[in-house]
A protein has these predicted regions:
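Surface loop/turn signatures of beta-propeller and other carbohydrate-active proteins
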Residues: 17-57, 76-79, 95-127, 159-188, ...
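Short glycine/acidic-enriched loop and turn motifs that connect beta-strands
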Residues: 73-77, 140-144, 202-206, 314-315
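A short loop-to-beta-strand structural motif that recurs across blades of beta-propeller domains
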Residues: 83-85, 150-153, 214-216, 265, ...
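Conserved Ser/Thr-centered positions that define the repeating blades of beta-propeller domains
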Residues: 89, 155-156, 217-220, 269
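Beta-rich accessory regions
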Residues: 27-31, 272-289, 297-493
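Bacterial Sec-dependent N-terminal signal peptides
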Residues: 1-17
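Entry beta-strands of beta-propeller and related beta-repeat scaffolds
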Residues: 65-68, 123-137, 192-197, 251-258, ...
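Short, solvent-exposed loop/turn segments at conserved positions within beta-propeller repeat blades
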Residues: 77-82, 143-148, 206-213, 260-261, ...
Length: 493
C-alpha cells in the first residue's frame, strides 16, 4: 500500500504539472559535500552552496529568523530552471541554506517575487501556532507564447514547505502590456487596511520618448482577489520594483515613500494607499555595475529598513573559469535612510551593524598623518576587510588609497573608482567606507549618499593597504577591521 500511495502521489503531481519533472529539481541533498572553502567563495556575502543564483526574493522576518529566498537554478551553474532557493539567518550575516522552497509547476518556472507575514489572517491559513508566510511570484511560461502571470503560495511551518494558492492559477492575470510582466511586491498598508501589490507591467519604448514604462498598483483584503488601484508611469522603471516608507531625518512625524526598480533608480514621494505621487526627480542608488534587483525585508523587528541586492558579474566566468561550484552572490545587507541635504531629500545606505560580529582584528588610528599610517600598516596582511576613513575637506586635495591593488582616488572633493565618480556633499568632513570580499568591493561615501558596488578580484598574494599622496595628509579616523568568515559556524538551530 505504501508503494501504491507514493505512485499515486507522483502520478497526480505529474498530471497537475505537465512539462515539469519535479523530482529533477529536488537537488539540495547533493549540496551536502560543499565546505565553503573554495578559493573564490565570498567570505561575508551570501552565496548558494552550489549552482546559480540571482535576484533576492521574499525577504521577510518572522519569529527570530530572517528569510532570504532567491532566484536559483538547482541544476546548473548558469541561469535557468528558476526556482526559489531559501536561506535563514538570526542576524542577517550568518546564513544557513535550506531545501529549495518553491519549485516549478505547469509549463513554467518560478520567477522573482515577495513574501509577507499574514498577521490579519487575510488568506485564512493561519494556525494556532503559526502565522502564514504568504509568497507571491511570477509564473514564467517556458514556451515563448503564453503570458506570464502572478501566482502565490503559503507556508505555515516557518517557510520550510509551501502550498500553492488556488493550485497555482493566476491571482493577478497578465495585464496585456508585456508578455513578461513580473516581480510582484506585496505589503500591508495600515492606514487603508489592505494589502497592496506593486507590479512592473510595461517597459518604456526607446524609440518613442512619450511611451513610458508602467508600474501598476493593486489592492486586496483577502490576498487572493486584487483590484487595480492606479498606475505609475516613468521612463526608468524596469522589473523588480519595491516601495517602502522611510522616516526623513529619523523623524516619525515626517515620512516619505521610496520607489525603486532593479537598476536602483529611485524617486521619493507620498503614497495614500491608492496612488503614488513623487517629485519626479530620478536618482541612482548605486553607481557601480553589479548591484541589481535589490529588495527590502518585510516586517523587520527594530524599524530598520534593510536592503539586499544581487551582486551580478558581467563576466560569469569569474566563477566558472575557476571551477567554482557556485555562481553569483548577494550584497551585504544595508540599512536605508532618507536624509535632508542641500540638494533635497536623498537616500543613504550603510552596512548593518551586525557586521561587527565578524571582526577578527581591528586597527583604529585617530588624528594620524598618512606617512605614519603607512608605517603602521606596513607588513600587516589584509584579506577581507571593513575599512573606514574620515578627513577634513579643506586640508585634503587629493590622494589614492591602495586596497590590495584596488585603487580608490580622492580628488577635488569626490571619490573615483574605475573612473566612476562618487560625488560627496559639500561639507567640511568627508568619509568613506569600503567592504572588500574575495571578488567584490562595496564603497560607501559620505555616510552612504554615494554607493558603488562592483566586482574586484585582488591577487591572493597582494595583502597590503597604503595611502599614496604627494603631500602629507591627516586622517581624523582611519579604521581597518579584518573580517572573519560567515561560514565558520551555523547560527540557525
Amino acid at each position: 500500500m505504501r508503494f501504491l500511495l507514493i505512485f499515486v502521489f507522483v502520478f497526480t503531481q505529474a498530471q497537475q504539472r505537465p512539462g515539469v519533472m519535479i523530482d529533477s529539481f529536488q537537488t539540495f541533498d547533493s549540496y551536502s559535500d560543499i565546505k565553503y572553502d573554495e578559493s573564490l567563495r565570498p567570505q561575508f556575502h551570501f552565496s548558494s552552496k552550489k549552482n546559480w543564483i540571482n535576484d533576492p526574493n521574499g525577504m521577510v522576518y518572522y519569529k527570530g529568523e530572517y528569510h532570504l529566498f532567491f532566484q536559483h537554478n538547482p541544476k546548473a551553474i548558469h541561469w535557468g530552471n528558476m526556482t526559489w532557493g531559501h536561506a535563514v539567518s538570526k542576524d542577517m550575516v550568518h546564513w544557513e541554506q535550506l531545501q529549495h522552497a518553491i519549485l516549478p509547476y505547469g509549463n513554467g518556472t518560478i520567477f522573482s517575487g515577495t513574501a509577507a507575514i499574514d498577521y490579519p489572517n487575510s488568506l485564512g491559513k493561519n494556525t494556532e501556532e503559526e502565522k502564514a508566510i504568504v509568497a507571491y511570484f511570477t509564473h514564467a511560461q517556458n514556451d515563448n507564447k503564453d503570458l506570464f502571470y502572478q501566482a502565490g503560495a503559503f507556508s505555515t511551518d516557518r517557510g520550510r514547505t509551501f502550498q500553492l494558492i488556488g493550485r497555482g492559477r493566476p491571482l493577478v492575470p497578465n495585464q496585456g502590456f508585456d508578455r513578461g510582466e513580473r516581480d510582484p511586491k506585496i505589503f500591508w498598508h495600515t492606514p487603508s487596511r489592505k494589502w497592496v501589490l506593486i507590479l512592473w507591467i510595461k517597459r518604456s519604448n526607446i524609440k518613442q520618448p512619450d511611451d513610458l514604462g508602467k508600474v501598476r498598483f493593486f489592492g486586496s483584503t483577502d490576498l487572493k482577489n486584487w483590484k487595480k488601484l492606479s498606475d505609475f508611469d516613468r521612463k526608468w522603471v524596469y522589473e523588480c520594483m519595491d516601495l517602502v516608507e522611510l522616516r526623513v531625518d529619523g523623524d516619525p512625524n515626517n515620512k516619505k515613500w521610496l520607489i525603486f526598480d532593479a537598476s536602483f533608480d529611485y524617486e521619493i514621494g507620498t503614497f495614500d494607499g491608492q496612488s503614488l505621487v513623487t517629485d519626479q526627480k530620478n536618482h541612482l542608488g548605486d553607481l557601480g555595475d553589479a548591484y541589481y534587483a535589490a529588495q527590502t525585508f518585510n516586517n523587520t523587528p527594530d524599524r530598520r529598513t534593510v536592503i539586499m541586492g544581487w551582486l551580478r558579474t558581467r563576466d560569469n566566468n569569474v566563477y566558472v573559469d575557476h571551477k567554482m561550484p557556485f555562481n553569483q552572490h548577494m550584497s551585504f545587507p544595508a540599512t536605508m535612510e532618507l536624509k535632508t541635504t542641500a540638494e533635497g531629500i536623498r537616500l543613504f545606505r550603510w552596512p548593518v551593524e551586525e557586521i561587527k560580529s565578524l571582526y577578527q582584528k581591528s586597527y583604529l588610528f585617530e588624528e594620524i598623518e598618512s606617512g605614519v599610517l603607512n608605517e603602521k600598516l606596513k607588513g600587516e596582511k589584509f584579506e577581507e576587510i571593513d575599512l573606514y576613513a574620515s578627513f577634513d575637506r579643506s586640508k585634503t586635495s587629493s590622494f589614492q588609497m591602495n586596497i590590495r591593488g584596488q585603487m580608490l582616488t580622492y580628488e577635488k572633493g569626490d571619490f573615483y573608482f574605475n573612473d566612476v565618480m562618487l560625488p560627496t556633499l559639500n561639507l567640511n568632513k568627508v568619509n568613506v567606507r569600503i567592504l572588500l570580499d574575495r571578488t567584490t568591493i562595496e564603497i560607501f561615501a559620505d555616510d552612504g549618499l554615494s554607493v558603488l558596488s562592483t566586482y574586484a578580484v585582488s591577487a591572493p598574494e597582494n595583502t597590503q593597504l597604503s595611502v599614496l599622496s604627494d603631500e602629507s595628509l591627516l586622517f581624523d579616523v582611519f579604521e581597518v577591521n579584518k573580517i572573519g568568515s560567515i561560514w565558520s559556524r551555523a547560527w540557525v538551530d
